């Protein structure tokens, strides 16, 4: 893999009902390297208001959500938290999380 990926070289793709969520998440895979890196992926999610990543458990992986823009509700182990731009959340192994965009949002996900 090259040491840099240019934004204009990365294609967007649609993820319908992500983790049984609502609507379609428009995704851009920034990094993908399960075989060669300690983490498996990094992607940018463009989510319209009302679109969600369904609540799901991380039994043997961890995942980070970083909200670039917009506003949303993070559900972590059944408790809801407001997320604003610049907020970050780590879902540790054995825990569950999901995200609902309450405004048009850009969410970066690393796992």
Language-model features, listed with the residues they occupy:
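Ligand-binding loop in jelly-roll beta-barrel domains
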Residues: 36, 93-111
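Glycine- and acidic-residue-biased ligand/ion/polar-headgroup-sensing regions
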Residues: 60-73, 77
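A short, compositionally biased micro-patch
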Residues: 48, 60, 67, 92-94, ...
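Short acidic-glycine-tyrosine-enriched beta hairpin
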Residues: 78-94
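A cytosolic small-molecule/anion-sensing beta-strand core signal
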Residues: 68-69, 84-85, 103
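A short, N-terminal "cap"/entry segment at the start of jelly-roll beta-barrel domains
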Residues: 1-39, 54
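Conserved short histidine dyad/triad with adjacent acidic residue
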Residues: 29, 41-59
């Amino acid at each position: 893999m090259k040491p840099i990926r240019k934004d204009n070289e990365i294609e967007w793709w649609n993820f319908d009902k992500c983790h049984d969520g609502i609507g379609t998440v428009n995704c851009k895979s920034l990094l993908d390297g399960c075989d060669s890196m300690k983490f498996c992926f990094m992607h940018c999610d463009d989510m319209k208001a009302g679109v969600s990543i369904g609540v799901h458990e991380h039994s043997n992986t961890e995942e980070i959500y970083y909200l670039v823009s917009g506003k949303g509700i993070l559900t972590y182990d059944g408790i809801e938290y407001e997320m604003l731009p610049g907020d970050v959340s780590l879902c540790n192994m054995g825990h569950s999380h999901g995200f609902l965009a309450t405004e048009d949002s850009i969410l970066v996900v690393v796992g």
